[in-house]
């Protein structure tokens, strides 16, 4: 390791582990005060994290440092606040429109990776690895089993992935490629809407055909690129080019804060409440007076004075 690299790493002091994972820390830059995430990953991922550092996108945490040390790779990346989709889905399903929008943004996140030379395949797209930030931005937060496509290779050298999201080729039938990630996007789309995997229950309606095409056993029968999947979702569902998903705690918060009280009682401000009481009393008395007057007119043909 170069002396300059060692100096840059020493700028970051470790504060605590993240989620009890021994290889991920929250760190702080001693000079700037910047809070960041430090990961210790396989050195085999150096080319991938170097690409992420050199080609930043809004859909992936910024990589500040990517330094090899003692046969390991030290990555310093952007610290994000928010919830991953798995956490969100513990309390609520995601509406069809929101789920489609999230997948569209994931397609945009994967596009530069799949178009890289050689192509980068995530291989572990799942709810726990997708974060919705407090700003409602979609981020892929884990590339620890990503790989680069190797021309002429019949299958992956290491079989890796998450069971429910893994495409058939991840079990050794053939080499993984961009269509492997498309398979996982189909699983994720179904899971967000139903909180069930396609093997348990398939989504109904207009997205069913899209999910089924993503999940074809033969990669040649799936959408061939994320561009194709994005276009289908856009044309079939919504034009969401400039929108951000609203998925997250907002749903529960909006429902909790929504008040069904009469006007004047919703703000819980004392003078507004008092004014409302006096107003409603006046209106009630006026209505009662008019009712008596109307009744007397019907009985006598003339109004009481």
Per-range role (PLM):
Residues 11-50:
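ATP-binding glycine-rich loop module of kinase domains
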Residues 56-65:
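Conserved HxN/HPN-centered segment at the entrance to the catalytic loop
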Residues 181:
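Conserved catalytic-loop aspartate of Hanks-type protein kinases
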Residues 222:
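Conserved HRD-motif arginine in the catalytic loop of eukaryotic-like protein kinases
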């Amino acid at each position: 390791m170069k002396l300059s690299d060692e100096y840059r790493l020493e700028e970051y002091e470790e504060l605590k582990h993240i989620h009890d994972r021994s290889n991920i820390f929250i760190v702080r830059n001693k000079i700037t005060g910047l809070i960041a995430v430090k990961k210790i990953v396989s050195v085999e991922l150096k080319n991938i994290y170097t690409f992420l550092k050199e080609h930043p996108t809004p859909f992936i945490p910024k990589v500040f440092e990517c330094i090899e040390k003692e046969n390991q790779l030290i990555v310093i990346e952007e610290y994000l606040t928010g919830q991953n989709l798995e956490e969100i889905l513990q309390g609520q399903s995601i509406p069809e429109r929101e789920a489609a929008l999230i997948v569209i943004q994931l397609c945009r996140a994967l596009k530069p990776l799949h178009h890289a030379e050689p192509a980068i395949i995530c291989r572990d797209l799942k709810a726990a690895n997708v974060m919705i930030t407090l700003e409602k931005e979609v981020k892929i937060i884990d590339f620890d089993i990503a790989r680069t496509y190797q021309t002429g290779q019949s299958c992956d050298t290491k079989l890796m992935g998450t069971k429910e999201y893994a495409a058939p080729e991840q079990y050794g039938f053939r080499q993984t490629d961009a269509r492997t990630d498309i398979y996982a996007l189909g699983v994720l789309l179904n899971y967000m809407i139903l909180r069930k995997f396609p093997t348990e229950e398939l989504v109904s309606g207009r997205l069913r055909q899209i999910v089924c095409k993503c999940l074809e056993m033969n990669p040649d029968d799936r959408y061939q690129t994320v561009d194709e999947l994005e276009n289908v979702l856009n044309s079939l569902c919504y034009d969401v080019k400039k929108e951000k998903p609203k998925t997250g705690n907002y749903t529960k918060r909006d429902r909790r804060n929504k008040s069904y009280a009469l006007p004047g009682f919703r703000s819980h401000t004392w003078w507004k409440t008092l004014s409302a009481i006096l107003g409603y009393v006046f209106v009630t008395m006026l209505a009662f007076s008019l009712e008596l007057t109307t009744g007397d007119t019907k009985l006598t043909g003339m109004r009481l004075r």
